[in-house]
Amino acid sequence: MFGELRDLLTGGGNETTTKKVKGTVVLMKKNVLDFNDFNASFLDRLHEFLGNKITLRLVSSDVTDSENGSKGKLGKAAHLEDWITTITSLTAGESAFKVTFDYETDFGYPGAFLIRNSHFSEFLLKSLTLEDVPGHGRVHYICNSWIYPAKHYTTDRVFFSNKTYLPHETPATLLKYREEELVSLRGTGEGELKEWDRVYDYAYYNDLGVPPKNPRPVLGGTQEYPYPRRGRTGRKPTKEDPQTESRLPITSSLDIYVPRDERFGHLKMSDFLAYALKAIAQFIQPALEAVFDDTPKEFDSFEDVLKIYEEGIDLPNQALIDSIVKNIPLEMLKEIFRTDGQKFLKFPVPQVIKEDKTAWRTDEEFAREMLAGLNPVVIQLLKEFPPKSKLDSESYGNQNSTITKSHIEHNLDGLTVEEALEKERLFILDHHDTLMPYLGRVNTTTTKTYASRTLLFLKDDGTLKPLVIELSLPHPNGDKFGAVSEVYTPGEGVYDSLWQLAKAFVGVNDSGNHQLISHWMQTHASIEPFVIATNRQLSVLHPVFKLLEPHFRDTMNINALARQILINGGGIFEITVFPSKYAMEMSSFIYKNHWTFPDQALPAELKKRGMAVEDPEAPHGLRLRIKDYPYAVDGLEVWYAIESWVRDYIFLFYKIEEDIQTDTELQAWWKEVREEGHGDKKSEPWWPKMQTREELVESCTIIIWVASALHAAVNFGQYPVAGYLPNRPTISRQYMPKENTPEFEELEKNPDKVFLKTITAQLQTLLGISLIEILSTHSSDEVYLGQRDSKEWAAEKEALEAFEKFGEKVKEIEKNIDERNDDETLKNRTGLVKMPYTLLFPSSEGGVTGRGIPNSVSI
């Protein structure tokens, strides 16, 4: 009591006391991740020794800095301790450093901190954790950002604690930091971007060609070639064409600009991916060309094809091997080539031929893969017979189907065509209208192919039976004269061989559609604008940023590598996929005529194809027209789990609709997605208006679904299903043999040889399976749906609990998938190839597993 009285009389007791607050910084030093930079570690230690340290300062959420406008008060500078002596690793190169702050007791909550790097090289800052902060206990900051030397920034870098704030809820002391951080991420829109830049900006796909010898049209920004935007690099235009951006040499592919925090850099697996892609483009392709220059470029039999899995391809060129060793870190070699450098390119046996080497050829498996294969997003309910084209008849003449009742009625298990239509038992795989506008041009290349329609019948046991295949060419006198079509049905003898060839042409159509549309355009390309807009317009403090950010990991990096090596003019896609140099142009045509944002929702997409119908009695009010449709059954479980989690989360932060309408960052984000990211579609009436919580829930669910589950469904089965190329040929090189010709005679004598001469050649086969093996591989540090790479991603207990509930639901889905795969009455789950459908099984280990839903389009 006397003490209190004394303080009252003397004004004592108000003085600020200082306490030591201890923290732990987790980071990865540059040399852990960089194979070639051995100097970085030494120079950083030298800088540290000379007093050039890493400095941190806390920022108060509660107390204003009188000298710094409305910004929060800054604490005293603190330094990372023991940089020189700390060599202990936590996991995969992570190091933990102590830091001690002088903490004034009236400082309040430390809502952010500033960091300055005075070392020679950059490091990856993972997190800062403070213990025993007066009045607040433990405070955690998630960073996951590269910190370059201070000379590369105009201000110190800022990081916020894991509390979540809508813009109007942000403490006034942090608001300026929040706004300034977004401004710096948007950049100025000028100049070439450098590796330390953090700028997210938009550009057209104008870097795919090399004029004048290998030009490609600019995709995006025109009515003729609309396209989603990609990340801007700011490279100069070519001298020959100011509309085309200059390209990096292939040897510098790994240096292509993406914002630094979007670049691969977790474990070796990410680097393995990048180096392996480079190896294919730079070394393996010319090596294979050299080997096959002196040998016939054909497989003579299916046994020949099997040898590439059982024996491997011998590349005896020692000079080539030496050049690979020089260009690829030694520790990568064994992983990429699986040998000591002599006989490489030996491939693992794809799952589709593991149990039975011939079941892939059956009609049952051909049909089953439309429901449970690589491209299960195309098959439709047939609503009219014969099928009609939607192409403009003035431009393309009569493109309607020439299939008649007599082609199929004998095969409908006693039903008439009308009855089969009425009972919803006829289905179509239709690659006619999407391909026909380009077919004449595609067939001027080495490709020789058709536009196809395949009709199928739903049998009583729930499986599909192929009935008929129609193969069409443009009229020789011009497109406007319509299509010239041939119809093929199952047969005996040589007619069975014709039927097998017809199925191969359907496979070629479907492979191209899968790779360019279902995979590249609908997941990789369409998601990138959301990645860019989210980083430009939503602060890391924003609840929607925290919701979506895990679903964007590595997407910009893999897409940039794709522009450099895969989808560019003369790149691996053009070499291995049938549309050749028209591949990307075709994907623009599909984006223009078929892509809408609301239809990316799985329920909407299934209804659009007639594969599902609203039914109040069915789970979630949706009934599948084919009950045993593995992609749709598993997919809907995953979709509704995502939607439920998103709704729980969004409703935590947005209590009323007005919260959505007055959220300045959210409205700017959605405006930019529509007007910039998908700017060629900005006037479409179907865009959600973003005025209600349900509109936000649906939009975020679509984004997460596309980035995670849809991408997994069309990507990670590539090697298991298509690694055996006769099952999913990607190119056709000669037309169907006609009766009374030498080609038809050869088909009668040696049907397998004709089949193999028709589909993908030996060189493209090896290139193609080299690529899809890499694309089907999970990295060892992958983060899967229902998981986060940090348990402290948010400070709000309710958000963490909602996510935990989602994680439990995901585990339940895994059990359900296992049970369905064990159910022998569900014949489409495994088929004659004895390959269970696991592409939407959420978790996986690393490698080629044919299962696992990573959070993002990360490969």
UniProtKB/Swiss-Prot annotation:
The encoding gene: LOX1
Expression sites by tissue: Seedlings, roots, leaves, and flowers (at protein level). Expressed in guard cells.
Name this protein carries in UniProt: Linoleate 9S-lipoxygenase 1
Cellular compartments per GO CC: plastid
Enzyme class: oxidoreductase
Family matches, as InterPro entries: LipOase, LipOase_C, LipOase_C_sf, LipOase_CS, LipOase_Fe_BS, LipOase_plant, Lipoxy_PLAT/LH2, Lipoxygenase_dom_3
Binding annotation for Fe cation: 519, 524, 711, 715, 859
PLAT domain residues: 21-161
Phenotype when the gene is knocked out: Increment in the number of lateral roots, and moderate increase in the length of the primary root. Enhanced disease resistance to the fungal pathogen Fusarium graminearum. Enhanced susceptibility to the bacterial pathogen Pseudomonas syringae pv tomato DC3000. The double mutant plants lox1 and lox5 exhibit enhanced susceptibility to the bacterial pathogen Pseudomonas syringae pv tomato DC3000 and the biotrophic powdery mildew pathogen Golovinomyces cichoracearum.
Cofactor: Fe cation
Pfam family, one: PLAT
PROSITE patterns referenced in this protein's UniProt entry, alphabetically: LIPOXYGENASE_1, LIPOXYGENASE_2, LIPOXYGENASE_3, PLAT
Inducers of expression: By pathogens (e.g. Pseudomonas syringae), wounding, abscisic acid (ABA) and methyl jasmonate (MeJA). Higher levels in light than in dark conditions. Induced by infection with the fungal pathogen Fusarium graminearum.
Subunit field text: Monomer.
Region (Disordered): 213-246
Matching SUPFAM superfamilies: Lipase/lipooxygenase domain (PLAT/LH2 domain) (SSF49723), Lipoxigenase (SSF48484)
Domain of life: Eukaryota
Domain spans labelled Lipoxygenase: 164-859
